[in-house]
């Protein structure tokens, strides 16, 4: 019997707001600078192997891809971001209509 629990991003509540706030502020800056259509890169990584470890194994790539592909800012997300008074209305409108269309480059799962 398989007792392993998995996390299915597609069937969970909206996880969009787990995004890094810095990424949102930078994206708003790109838009305000007229670079809305410029290709940019954001990374998901760590700088140092934890606990003085000597290696790391890539795991969870499928869930990362599902998360990115399902990113959708709902009305509550937009209202919250608006309440912070950090983002332009143009950017909030952009987020409300956002759909990921980029590419994801990653190490092979399990390596």
Where are these regions (language model features)?
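Ordered alpha/beta subdomains of enzyme catalytic regions
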Residues: 1-111
